[in-house]
Amino acid sequence: MVKRNLKGRGDKLSANAPLDNQLEAGKVAKQRDELREKQKRKREDSQTDEFVPDSLSSKILNEARKQLLEEALERQETESATSSVPKRQRGAWLGADASGDKSDDDDDDNEEEDDNGFEDQVVELDPRDEADLARFLKKDAIQMSTLYDIIQAKIEAKQNDAELALSQVDPNEFNMRDMDPEVVEMYEQIGQYMSKYRSGKVPKAFKIIPKMINWEQILFLTKPETWTAAAMYQATRLFASNMNPKMCQRFYTLVLLPRLRDDIDEFKKLNYHLYQALCKAIYKPAAFFKGLILPLLESGTCTLREAVIFSSVLTKVPIPIFHSAAAMLRIAEMEYTGANSVFLRALIDKKYALPYRAVDGVVNHFIRLKTDERDMPVLWHQCLLALCQRYKNDLNAEQKAAIYELIRFHGHYLISPEIRRELESKETEDGHVITSVVVEGRKTDSMEF
């Protein structure tokens, strides 16, 4: 038996009719359900019949009119009490009383009158009233500030505190501060790591040392004397690029210079990584001369081996002219040692166009040794020869005469004739070159770093 499908929800099941009746029913359209038609008409009638009766609408309008009148009276009383200036009153228009025989068109007209009845209100205050009101206001009222103002004020306060702290820091003083035991332990562990360092990344905590106020205290917690040569190279790179010249000079004098001298003294040569650190140190020329070269010479214990190794960096790396001139002048004013001649010759051979004061200072360095009874070493004669070869055109007649007199007292059987030949050589107009210069806008009298 075939299963019969229902046509829709709520279909009634009917018994099977005879075949002839089914055929007749299929020819004629099925009539719609009378019950559904009745329900639909009832819903439509209920929707169309929903309206407010005339009696109820009149009551609503009367109540609304009373409320508006009460509000208008209250507003008028308050305005008359607070201000002596008469103000225009708002009009509340609801039209005449609504009656049962009025149509909906009359109600629409009344609504338009309600909208047009309210006019803009212009308020004028008497200056005396304003003055009286101002007397009751707080004179020290707190000004409202936005979130941006609060954050900006905090940022400026932090910046001012940081600038004040940095301005009070003396680079020549060792800043001691109380430190957290955990911080001390961390940097001691970093020191152990640097004592075994060969290659790779440096700890981030070590990289921030140059930015700290008490950087010297933290640095010595890592025990720099135990660092490997590769660690010293990385530290020199870091400090030379992130510190100002004064702080960098302290690092060179306290950490780098002792390590370089110890390595040369122990192994009679300089480790490759330490030599690279020495080359990187010249990134700050003023700190290089004032933190390495000048302290080395002023110590009085600089050996020729150390002088040759340190001066070799000067011949390989370009140096600013005025830093070179200032260094030459400072070295020339020192008490003579063999190491002084090594550094002076290295700077002279760079063939820089030096200021006249630097050239005069080097010449006076040689002339004042005329009365010295010691036999001058070959390094001294070679340095004097280099000076005459490079800057003979900048020497005046008095200086040349003084040099002639000097080589009579301190002569060398091979070098002194060469010095005399350089001074006596005739300069043609084509070959004459003036090497010393005067820089516009800068005083050459003050030879400072």
From Swiss-Prot:
GO terms for molecular function: snoRNA binding. Residues 103-124 have a biased composition (Acidic residues). It comes from the Eukaryota. Residues 1-58, 71-125 are annotated as: Disordered. GO terms for biological process: rRNA processing. InterPro entries: Bystin (IPR007955). Residues 30-46 have a biased composition (Basic and acidic residues). GO terms for cellular component: cytoplasm; nucleolus; preribosome, small subunit precursor. Belongs to the bystin family. PANTHER family: BYSTIN (PTHR12821:SF0). This is Uncharacterized protein byn-1. The gene is byn-1.
